[in-house]
Structure formats: C-alpha cells, structure tokens
Swiss-Prot record:
It comes from Haemophilus influenzae (strain ATCC 51907 / DSM 11121 / KW20 / Rd). The lineage of its organism: Bacteria, Pseudomonadati, Pseudomonadota, Gammaproteobacteria, Pasteurellales. The keyword GTP-binding does not apply. This is Putative peroxiredoxin bcp. Belongs to the peroxiredoxin family. BCP/PrxQ subfamily. It catalyses: a hydroperoxide + [thioredoxin]-dithiol = an alcohol + [thioredoxin]-disulfide + H2O.
Length: 155
C-alpha cells in the first residue's frame, strides 16, 4: 500500500452515491473536498467517524469543505447508513475498490489474527484545483473531524 501524498493531483473518478446517482470529483472543482475512505458502513468505528463529521457539518460548511465518504459498500447500504445515522453528506460506493487503489488506500490488513485486503482508514484534503493539500492517516477515529477542523482553521 502506497497512499498518495501532499502535492499529488487527486485522481479523477466517478462513483455512484447513496441515491444511485453518479458523482464525480470534478463536480466539486473550485471547492475544498475531504475524501475520507472507510472500511464498512454501519460498523462501530466507521459510524463514530461518520457521526463526528455529521455533527461538525455546519462548521465544515463555514470552512468551505465538501465531505465525500468512500467505501466498498453498495449504494443501498450507504442509503441505510445515511438514514439510520442521519448523515448529512454524500457517501460513494467503490465496490471494486478501483478508486481506493488509485488513492493507494487498498491493501493488506490484519484483524483478529486474520489477514485480508481492505480499505485503510485514510483521508485526503483536496484543494480547489484538485491537488492533495493534506493527508490524514494517523488519528483516533473519535478525533477525525476535529483534526480536520483544526487543520482548516490553521490555513
């Protein structure tokens, strides 16, 4: 696994959202975008991370940030995640993990003595022209949203 780094151009992509509508990164040209990769909808860690972003949405809006969550889950599962947890941002389905691979976040993981391939929990902050301006790869899940807010405030 070799995640993209600061200064790299974010790869162009188009994925289905929770409403089974196509969303492209280029739709947000001219805006700052947080692309956060997470392993699986409606699991404890992913729910904590998503709810932190949900609860910070008004502040993230003031800071001019668009939030896009990407996982291998199907659009129907993403819709359930949004409904059950009242999420207020877009989730995208990457079932074949092609976008995760382009960003370098798909790779070997170990959990409970088992080794498998999956998404690593890494977030990319992309500037208005599509360049990666920050990579968040070491954080406590419960602090993810605050770390992003603190970074944006420091600019």
């Amino acid at each position: 696994m070799n995640p993209l780094s600061v200064g790299n151009q974010a790869p162009a992509f188009t994925l289905l959202n929770q409403q089974e509508k196509f969303v492209s990164l280029s739709d947000f040209r001219g805006k700052k975008v947080l692309i956060y990769f997470y392993p699986k909808a409606l699991t404890p860690g992913c729910t904590t991370q998503a709810c932190g972003l949900r609860d910070s949405k008004s502040e993230l809006d003031v800071l001019g940030l668009v939030v896009l969550g990407i996982s291998p889950d199907a659009p129907k599962k993403l819709a359930q995640f949004i409904e059950k947890k009242e999420l207020n941002f877009t989730l995208l389905s990457d079932p074949d993990h092609q976008v995760a691979e382009q960003f370098g976040v798909w790779g070997e993981k170990k959990f409970m003595g088992r080794t498998y391939d999956g998404i690593h929990r890494i977030s990319f902050l992309i500037n208005e022209s599509g360049t990666i301006m920050q990579v968040f790869d070491k954080f406590k899940i419960k602090d993810h949203h605050q770390m992003i807010i603190d970074y944006l405030r420091s600019l």
